[in-house]
């Protein structure tokens, strides 16, 4: 089907608060749709990467041994790969009509769990030397009971601290893939796609500025909200902005 390009209308024109893009779509509505996509993506992405990262990290830190060393080597190899290019190559092999949100997020999740695993592993190694873990062992608690009932609750601070960075990572990754044309189909509202549209038509600066501001404001809000939640969970460690 031949694509019809329109001249983007500026803001406050024809009832469009932020104007329109080259396809005649209302930018404000498109940004709101992109926000919904990012929220849905985060709700899918976060459980996947944190389930993998927490499980592997706790097992590596608690049991150690050859399995720990092997997993570390695997993580080191994968962490050296430019994950965005790998995801682009893998996504390019998938037909566009099959390239849905879940598939893209699974591809991103293949790399998103590794830094979580390392931090959880280090924290678990520290926690397993605590007196409460030794007391649980004396009372006959098994390793899985100790991990689930004693060590996992003490990892809450790490999880809360990492959450805003994980959300920012998935938002930026989706925007980058959409900008490069390897992201979600056109049926999804993508801020990266809007950014690409704006950069290709710099004579209409409100298009690119709207997408850029949406990304910056969202990432700043995620960071500050995450910091506030972290301070509420762990008030002993405060970060002050001057």
Predicted features, each with a name:
Residues 1-54, 58-59, 66, 80, ...:
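Gly/Trp-centered helix-boundary motif
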Residues 17, 21, 25, 48-53, ...:
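Generic hydrophobic transmembrane alpha-helix motif, especially the helices
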Residues 25-40, 64-72, 125, 129, ...:
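Amphipathic cytosolic juxtamembrane alpha-helices at the membrane-cytosol interface
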Residues 37, 69, 76-83, 112-115, ...:
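Membrane-embedded alpha-helical bundles that form the substrate/pore pathway
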Residues 37-41, 56, 68-72, 100-106, ...:
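Short alpha-helical transmembrane interface motifs in multi-pass membrane proteins
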Residues 85-89, 93, 105, 109-115, ...:
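Non-cytoplasmic
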Residues 96-103, 166-169, 186, 190-217:
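Transmembrane alpha-helical segments in multi-pass inner-membrane proteins
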Residues 123-132, 228-236:
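Transmembrane helix boundary and interhelical loop/hinge segments in multi-pass membrane proteins
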């Amino acid at each position: 089907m031949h694509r019809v390009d329109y001249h983007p209308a500026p803001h406050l024109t024809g009832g469009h608060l932020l104007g329109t893009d080259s396809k005649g779509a209302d930018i404000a509505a498109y940004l709101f749709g992109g926000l919904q996509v990012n929220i849905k993506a985060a709700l899918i992405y976060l459980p996947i990467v944190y389930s993998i990262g927490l499980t592997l990290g706790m097992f590596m830190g608690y049991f150690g041994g050859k399995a720990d060393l092997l997993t570390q080597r695997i993580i080191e190899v994968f962490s050296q790969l430019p994950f965005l290019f790998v995801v682009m190559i893998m996504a390019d092999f998938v037909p566009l009509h099959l390239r849905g949100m879940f598939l893209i997020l699974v591809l991103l999740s293949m790399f998103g769990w590794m830094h979580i695993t390392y931090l959880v592993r280090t924290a678990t190694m520290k926690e397993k030397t605590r007196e409460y873990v030794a007391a649980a062992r004396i009372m006959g608690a098994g390793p899985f009971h100790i991990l689930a009932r004693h060590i996992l609750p003490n990892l809450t601070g790490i999880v809360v601290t990492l959450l805003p960075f994980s959300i920012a990572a998935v938002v930026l990754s989706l925007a980058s893939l959409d900008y490069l044309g390897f992201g979600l189909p056109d049926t999804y509202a993508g801020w990266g796609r809007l950014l690409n549209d704006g950069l290709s038509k710099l004579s209409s600066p409100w298009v690119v500025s709207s997408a850029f501001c949406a990304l910056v404001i969202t990432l700043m809000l995620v960071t500050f909200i995450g910091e506030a939640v972290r301070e509420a969970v762990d008030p002993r460690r405060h970060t002050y902005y001057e």
